[in-house]
From Swiss-Prot:
One of its GO terms (molecular function) is 3-deoxy-7-phosphoheptulonate synthase activity. This is Putative phospho-2-dehydro-3-deoxyheptonate aldolase. Pathway: Metabolic intermediate biosynthesis; chorismate biosynthesis; chorismate from D-erythrose 4-phosphate and phosphoenolpyruvate: step 1/7. Keywords: Amino-acid biosynthesis, Aromatic amino acid biosynthesis, Transferase. Pfam families: DAHP_synth_1. InterPro entries: Aldolase_TIM, DAHP1/KDSA, DAHP_synth_1. It comes from the Eukaryota. It comes from Schizosaccharomyces pombe (strain 972 / ATCC 24843) (Fission yeast). GO terms for biological process: amino acid biosynthetic process; aromatic amino acid family biosynthetic process; chorismate biosynthetic process. Stereospecific condensation of phosphoenolpyruvate (PEP) and D-erythrose-4-phosphate (E4P) giving rise to 3-deoxy-D-arabino-heptulosonate-7-phosphate (DAHP). Its EC number is 2.5.1.54. It catalyses: D-erythrose 4-phosphate + phosphoenolpyruvate + H2O = 7-phospho-2-dehydro-3-deoxy-D-arabino-heptonate + phosphate.
Length: 368
């Protein structure tokens, strides 16, 4: 009998022949969603609050509520202390404008990158390239719970089919980004999420793929993911009716103006979709200059005040202090407090001024 090399535990004939994992450095175990949700459990009061925030967002998207849905906050969260201070301030504004605006805090934990860069708090919570994802998951859930305790709802972006198992019970509204709206995997994921989802137009400005994504995610799907116990499973969904498009501009130019909104409205109606449009004041619409966001918001406010009912939401990248900063390679203590480490944001004073403008626009729209 020919001699052969015995297989190591967890090895296979294929890996011995180097036909798999040839570019994999290693595998690290990850904590299960069930354990994290038990360790950092949400109270009944918190879950009831999340459900109510979702309902209000869905009602606005569907036209049953004439307020504007505002998704406002940092491009990404990197400092739990600053995030909580922002949430406390935002909650006061949410109460102040509750008759005209439904304000949810943008609390993004993962960042899609066009090339490379810091991928977010879950991926690298220590901002030092150590990629302690198990710590990142815990930090992320703890932050979400603390933000919700301030009395403000939270919004986040969906980047994969696994991380929502750890956090989705706390999210009030979700986004599928411009780079992933066309992805079948993300459309399948959206079809099973328990909260409203906004699909951004493509980076080239194409809104057709966002409408296609709405159609796809409204239907049932089957896809691979993991259970709360961390077991790989086939997920069967029922479809998500609470979806809408987000105009964020693109390489072809901005799309927040009245003509672009009218065109998007017509396209949605042509595809038998409810003309419900959120406009992103940042990204392509701001030409990647945060100082342009209030100008974009002013244009949106003018359209709303003039009676445009298709505009149901606005997204703003905002932080305690304006601008952005790079993550230092060595001394993290040198970082500025309340300043974004990803996209540049407008500061707090500009943010509250935009709230006033949009709230006034909603009141004017009611007279049409």
């Amino acid at each position: 009998m020919d001699k052969h090399t015995p297989l190591l535990p967890g090895d296979s004939v294929f890996s011995r022949c180097k036909t798999e994992d040839s570019r994999i450095k290693g595998y690290d175990p990850v904590i299960s969603p069930a354990l994290i949700q038990s360790e950092l459990a949400a109270s009944d009061e918190t879950l009831a609050f999340v459900s109510d925030q979702r309902r209000q967002a869905a009602d606005i998207i569907a036209g049953r509520d004439d307020r504007l849905l505002l998704i406002v906050g940092p491009c990404s969260l990197h400092d739990p202390v600053a995030a909580k201070e922002y949430a406390i301030r935002l909650q006061k504004e949410a109460i102040k404008h509750k008759k005209d605006l439904h304000i949810i805090m943008r609390a993004y934990l993962e960042k899609p990158r066009t090339t490379v860069g810091w991928k977010g708090l879950i991926n690298d919570p220590d901002l030092d390239g150590s990629y302690n994802i198990n710590k990142g998951i815990r930090v992320a859930r703890r932050i979400f719970l603390e933000l919700l305790e301030t009395g403000v709802g939270i919004a986040s972006e969906m980047l994969d089919t696994i991380s929502p198992q750890y956090l989705a019970d706390l999210i009030c509204w979700g986004a599928i980004g411009a780079r992933t709206t066309e992805s079948q995997l993300h459309r399948e994921l959206a079809s099973g999420l328990s909260f409203p989802i906004g699909f951004k137009n493509a980076t080239d400005g194409n809104i057709g793929i966002a409408i296609d994504a709405m159609n796809s995610s409204a239907n049932p799907h089957h896809f691979l993911s993991v259970t709360k116990q961390g077991v790989v499973a086939i997920v069967t969904t029922t479809g998500n009716p609470d979806t809408h498009i987000i105009l964020r501009g693109g390489k072809s130019g901005t799309n927040f103006d009245a003509d672009s909104v009218a065109g998007a409205k017509a396209k949605l109606e042509e595809c038998n979709k409810l003309p419900s449009i959120m406009i992103d004041c940042s990204h392509g619409n701001s030409s990647k200059n945060h100082k342009n966001q209030p100008k974009v918001a002013a244009c949106i406010a003018e359209q709303v005040a003039n009676g445009q009912k298709a505009i149901t939401g606005v997204m703003i990248e905002s932080h305690l202090n304006e601008g952005k900063q790079a993550i230092p390679e060595d001394d993290l203590s040198s970082m500025k407090y309340g300043v974004s480490v990803t996209d540049a944001c407008i500061g707090w004073d500009d943010t509250t001024a935009v709230f006033e403008q949009l709230a006034a626009a909603v009141r004017s729209r009611r007279s049409h």
